[in-house]
Amino acid sequence: AYGIYWDTNDLDSYLSLFTDDAVGESYNDKGEKITVRIKDKRKMLKSMERMDYFESNGIQRRHMMCNTLILELSESFAHLKQYTILLTTNKNSKVEIVTPIFYDFKLKKTEGIWKISYRLINLDAPLDLKLMP
């Protein structure tokens, strides 16, 4: 659901996959770790702006997620790593690989539902964030 909700610009469903206190980590161009709250209002606004930009400019993303490695699994906790190839199709014409991604996810099961509580994004190459004005 993670890639499908993001790729179809369904922010509400995408955010429903995360706990209310979910943490996201990634690295900037200088290799410094950046930590954010996934459901922080500014973070959600940036995500919405990015989805709107993709949609209005004819950019389609596809997260090709595979090679899931479950490191730990209990009744209420899971820790896994997963490879992703992030593709983009611009103006319905050219398909390109944006970057391979190596995700680190931690999930919690609450009231019978698994939700992401932690997500680390390791990129092999920078995202094309410069596309946005």
Model-assigned labels for residue ranges:
Residues L11-Y83:
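A solvent-exposed, acidic/Ser-Thr-rich amphipathic alpha-helical stretch
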Residues T8-D10, G112:
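Alpha-helical hinge/cap motifs
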Residues F54-P133:
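A beta-strand edge to alpha-helix "cap/lid" segment located at domain peripheries
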Residues A1-D7:
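Short, aromatic-enriched amphipathic alpha-helices that serve as compact interaction elements
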